[in-house]
Amino acid sequence: MFPLPFGNARYAPIAAEDQGRVIAAILNDSAEHAGKTYPLYGPKELTQYEVADILTQVLGRKITYVPVEIEAFSEIWKEMGYSPYIRQHISAVAQDCRDGVFSGTNDLVEKLTGQKPLQLVDYITKHKAAFTLADKTHTK
């Protein structure tokens, strides 16, 4: 079970390695990209319910998304000892997500890097050990 404050919002999660490849491509041809802004998205919009289903599929155990209000989430994290900064940051990201700021998809990762972005299921499969480790440890 994972309580998060994203409601039913849809967004297209992008893998860090895809972001890294985009950054490398831009740095390798900085003149071509000077002054440009690139909105980066993963390949498919998902809700947190769908993310939980993918986690369940890959990890082999039931993962349930529990939507909570942003304020309640911040309080839960406060009780867990998280800093005011991270609580404010996640709260702002959650509000932006609910407001549709992260909605949409595009093909910029592939256009800029020559590689299709990772699907979430592939990312979780590739990094399955990290998700298992997260069950055994809790860092703030």
Functional labels for PLM-detected ranges:
Residues 71-140:
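A hydrophobic C-terminal alpha-helical subdomain
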